[in-house]
Amino acid sequence: MSISASLVKELRDLTGAGMMDCKTALAETNGDIEAAVDWLRAKGIAKADKKAGRTAAEGLVGVAASGNKAVVVEVNSETDFVARNDAFQDLVRKIAQAALSTDGSTEAVANANVDGKTVTETAKDAVATIGENIGFRRSAALTVPQGVVATYIHNGVADGLGKLGVLVAIETAGDAEAANAFGRQVAMHVAAINPLALTAEDVDPAAAEREKAIFIEQARESGKPDNIIEKMIEGRMRKFYEEVVLLSQAFVINPDLTVAAALKEAEKTIGAPAKITGFVRVALGEGIEKEETDFAAEVAAAAKG
């Protein structure tokens, strides 16, 4: 029988499944909507396996905090449209909450419990109702023995969910609310500037050597004496560290201060010494090579059957 576009749309609205899957389901069930819904549910696992090869570079980053610990997770989907889906957002929230009971490592979170199943299994099951390849990609956590771990979401679509998530750990015995407020400002800074490391000692030596090699080559081309070249390289490396090290960077909230100096100022409000002990920045789809899709071609393919 001929399957109308309106029938396909109705089934897609009901289930959130993909267009081609809806058309196949209706063809298999002679256009019976209820039977087609059941058919799609029955094929949920098979569909998840079939879709697993498709690139999931969209999705959401979620954060969750409890006491002196916070976590950030990334869950991918194939389209930004699905990232605005309530069911998908609920899934990311559940995964973030489940992550709080682990050490935050990607492996531990993948095996954490969500409604009686692992995070990996739960994400796979969601394919049947959401209609796209869904995948838990990565996670991280920060903890302090005393103090706070502030969180920040950039480009938020809902509370604790967005395209970029940041955690900043502040160790202090002072006022937690004041520490969290400052920590959030630092997290906003991290989101905007994307520092490479907390301190100069934390910078990857290989990255520093690469920069130094470039500076040496540039300095040699100047034709200046070796003693001048050496000072030029020292100056450029100093500037390099100022640009990539969080504590040495000009604070976005107040560029007249470095982040380290801003922390000293914040101690007055916090009421005790404070130390930034770590940060994590997770940007959605970072490092994923995204496929180019042609929606018009998808519609045309569906129309041809």
UniProtKB/Swiss-Prot annotation:
Xref: PROSITE patterns: EF_TS_2
Entry GO MF terms: translation elongation factor activity
Region of interest (Involved in Mg(2+) ion dislocation from EF-Tu), ranges: 79-82
Keyword annotations: Cytoplasm, Elongation factor, Protein biosynthesis
Keyword Protein biosynthesis attached: yes
InterPro entries assigned: EF-Ts_dimer_sf (IPR036402), Transl_elong_EFTs/EF1B (IPR001816), Transl_elong_EFTs/EF1B_dimer (IPR014039), Transl_elong_Ts_CS (IPR018101), UBA-like_sf (IPR009060)
Keyword Protein biosynthesis set for record: yes
Localization in the cell: Cytoplasm
Main location: cytoplasm
Pfam families assigned to the protein according to its UniProt record, in alphabetical order: EF_TS (PF00889)
Disulfide bonds: none
GO cellular component terms given for this protein: cytoplasm
Role, per record: Associates with the EF-Tu.GDP complex and induces the exchange of GDP to GTP. It remains bound to the aminoacyl-tRNA.EF-Tu.GTP complex up to the GTP hydrolysis stage on the ribosome.
Protein family: Belongs to the EF-Ts family.
Name recorded for this polypeptide: Elongation factor Ts
Organism: Brucella anthropi (strain ATCC 49188 / DSM 6882 / CCUG 24695 / JCM 21032 / LMG 3331 / NBRC 15819 / NCTC 12168 / Alc 37)
Organism lineage string: Bacteria, Pseudomonadati, Pseudomonadota, Alphaproteobacteria, Hyphomicrobiales
